[in-house]
């Protein structure tokens, strides 16, 4: 009789080819058997009857701000929040840690913190700016999963924006290195001029902010970045895409063979500009949240498989930085704990979006795109990463439920349908019934070349 480390019995397993009732056996942190019924014994047996077993999610876009801005968030608190939402891995952005991840020294400083403090697995983005073109090779050797650049001002002076020369030379280099570039796409000149004009005329409200960053700023820049990618052969990922027209540009480029993808974020699917007026600065982000008509079209693009993955763009700050006029306060939303629950509520329950596609958007595609081996789906030989979900459990998110350093989110007070009861990383339970139940066991994820 076979003996395993872990058996999950009687669950509804969200596999790449569909949802089916099955048992899952785990040994040495890997999935070794999936069958209707698995005989044998295990060190641990979990009865998952009534639960859906999703692949643990990988959040491709977080700002945990560690080291250097730990008064905003830390790897400890951020990774705990991710686990509470069914997360098993994240890719941390090269800002707003300080110093930014622009060379090997600062990569290794961040790595040392994560090795000590990260509850879940982690990968790191390197930065591409006008000041570090000579550092791309050393960052690639460190094992970055890709590079991040801003076409407009990043919000902090220590991470300069990518000008056209940097885009050309940088993308040529990254094409040779075989690593992707993710770009925050907003036209620098238009956003700068409109913002300055608005401030000069004391127009600092929610709608003034929207007017200073209109859809054309994203649409134009996405088009230009696609042109750079097409000419250089660099794999391109459009960050936090917010307009359906920009998604269409990506789909058209992919149809003609350009290696380009886009991610979107939950708040572009769940919130509208009217919600931002109601919620205030807690819902300020860049690009801004758009109107209801665009949101409806974004859902259409999601159903048509034009969006590769959904991330949180978790970007917290000291709450004091959210006090003041909307135009002037920090832009960023705290959301890494609610990505899966949000999609279960708004996609599956509200719009009958398939569970398999939710698993693809939150786990499978992001690991495939970034060449992370053995992660992102429930299949033989893959890491035993699971989120156990009660699909019909309804709850109201309370501030005290959040594991963030600051208990702040635009979703506090919202009603969700679909909750995570347990998160398992490589066969070890790390979160269960509202509590973190493991020491940090995260490992560094590198692209598999």
Curated annotation (Swiss-Prot):
Binds 2 Zn(2+) ions per subunit. It is an enzyme of class 3 (hydrolase). Zn(2+) 1 binds at residues 61, 63, 148, 313. The modification N6-carboxylysine is found at residue 148. Carboxylation allows a single lysine to coordinate two zinc ions. Homotetramer. This is Allantoinase. The lineage of its organism: Bacteria, Bacillati, Bacillota, Clostridia, Eubacteriales.
């Amino acid at each position: 009789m076979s003996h395993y480390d872990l058996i999950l019995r009687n669950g509804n397993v969200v596999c790449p080819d569909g949802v089916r009732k099955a048992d899952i056996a785990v040994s040495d942190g890997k999935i070794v058997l999936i069958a209707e019924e698995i005989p044998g014994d295990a060190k641990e047996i979990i009865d998952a009857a009534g639960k859906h077993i999703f692949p643990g999610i990988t959040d491709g876009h977080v700002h945990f701000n560690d080291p250097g801005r730990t008064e905003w968030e830390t790897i400890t608190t951020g990774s705990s929040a991710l686990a509470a939402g069914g997360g098993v891995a994240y890719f941390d952005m090269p800002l707003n840690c300080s110093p930014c991840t622009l060379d090997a020294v600062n990569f290794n400083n961040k790595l040392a913190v994560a090795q000590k403090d990260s509850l879940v697995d982690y990968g790191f983005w390197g930065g591409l700016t006008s000041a570090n073109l000579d550092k791309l090779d050393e960052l690639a050797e460190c094992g970055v999963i890709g590079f991040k650049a801003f076409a407009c001002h990043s919000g902090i002076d220590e991470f300069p924006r990518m000008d056209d020369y940097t885009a050309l030379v940088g993308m040529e280099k990254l094409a040779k290195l075989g690593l992707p570039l993710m770009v925050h796409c907003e036209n620098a000149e238009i956003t700068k001029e409109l913002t300055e004009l608005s401030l000069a005329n004391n127009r600092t409200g929610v709608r003034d902010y929207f007017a200073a960053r209109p859809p054309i700023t994203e649409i134009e820049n996405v088009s230009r970045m696609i042109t750079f990618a097409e000419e250089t052969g660099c794999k391109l990922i459009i960050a936090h895409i917010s307009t359906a027209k920009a998604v269409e540009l990506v789909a058209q480029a992919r149809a003609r063979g350009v290696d380009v993808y886009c991610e979107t974020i939950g708040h572009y699917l769940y919130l509208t500009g009217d919600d931002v007026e109601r919620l205030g600065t807690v819902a300020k982000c860049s690009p801004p949240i758009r109107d209801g008509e665009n949101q409806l079209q974004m859902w259409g693009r999601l159903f048509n498989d034009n969006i590769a993955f959904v991330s949180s763009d978790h970007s917290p700050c000291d709450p004091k930085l959210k006090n003041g006029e909307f135009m002037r306060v920090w832009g960023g939303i705290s959301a890494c704990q609610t990505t899966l629950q949000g999609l279960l509520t708004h996609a599956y329950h509200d719009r009958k979006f398939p569970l398999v596609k939710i698993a693809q958007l939150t786990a499978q595609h992001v690991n495939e795109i970034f060449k992370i081996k053995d992660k992102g789906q429930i299949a033989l030989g893959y890491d035993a990463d699971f989120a156990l979900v009660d699909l019909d459990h309804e709850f109201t998110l309370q501030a005290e439920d959040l594991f963030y350093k600051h208990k702040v989110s635009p979703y506090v007070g919202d009603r969700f349908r679909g909750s995570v009861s347990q998160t398992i990383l490589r066969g070890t339970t790390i979160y269960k019934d509202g509590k973190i139940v493991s020491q940090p066991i995260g490992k560094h994820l590198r692209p598999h070349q």
